UniProtKB/Swiss-Prot annotation:
Component of the Mediator complex. GO terms for biological process: regulation of transcription by RNA polymerase II. GO terms for cellular component: mediator complex. Belongs to the Mediator complex subunit 28 family. Keywords: Activator, Coiled coil, Nucleus, Transcription, Transcription regulation. Residues 76-108 form a coiled coil. One of its GO terms (molecular function) is transcription coregulator activity. This is Mediator of RNA polymerase II transcription subunit 28. It is found in: Nucleus. InterPro entries: Mediator_Med28 (IPR021640). It comes from Drosophila pseudoobscura pseudoobscura.
Amino acid sequence: MAQNDPGSGNLMDEFEEAFQSCLLSLTKQEPNSGTNKEEIELEVQKTTNRFIDVARQMEAFFLQKRFLVSTLKPYMLIKDENQDLSIEIQRKEALLQKHYNRLEEWKACLSDIQQGVHNRPTPPINPGMLQGPSGMQQPMGGGVPPRPGLMPGMPPGGMSPVGPMPPGQQHMLQAQQMQQLRMMGKLPPK
């Protein structure tokens, strides 16, 4: 292995020593030792610079070794790249499969909604109910008095719909809301 100074050990040992001395200078808590703040900052700066220098030397060492491997054994580099690509392909295939599964769930939900709309008969209008000015059905006669602040025929939310909502559309809207609640985890799955 490459050595920086004779007798100082290998580069990995130097890196470990520089890291430990850097941590020691950062975590040292000796307010009563007679050293002032400037001396501590100088020591931290010195040990940090030493750590960065040794890290750069290690990076250069490994880059040299990588270059040697790529020139002497180019098939190893290609093998590594193939392995990385196969891992990336597997990850993307899993992601695609997840999206396909979600798509199938949504298709099934849409199919259920469409079948429910076509198979569901429209409810007959009760002779005791009249259609109000907003298209909402209201009981004939006295019925329930309107709440204060709301006009008769307005839904409880206070906003008048533009027109009457067909029962099939209402059913589809409810089914979509139920599916959204299931997807958010607020309702148990079917």
